[in-house]
Amino acid sequence: MKTAKEYSDTAKREVSVDVDALLAAINEISESEVHRSQNDSEHVSVDGREYHTWRELADAFELDIHDFSVSEVNR
């Protein structure tokens, strides 16, 4: 499981995001491939649109980044 830190405005702290789970959900919703940049681990593109943070990606697909925090995934 790949994780990344993302600042949570709600919790006012950084949370660990399960990147693999987030990308799997995006892949299923968009029905297209998620392409990750080799130069920047947080830079991805979906359907030709580029996203620079995990929060930006989740928001674009109307997902709550907190649903992909490590503590939520392990529940």
From Swiss-Prot:
One of its GO terms (biological process) is single-species biofilm formation on inanimate substrate. InterPro entries: Uncharacterised_YodD. It comes from the Bacteria. This is Uncharacterized protein YodD. It comes from Escherichia coli (strain K12). The gene is yodD.
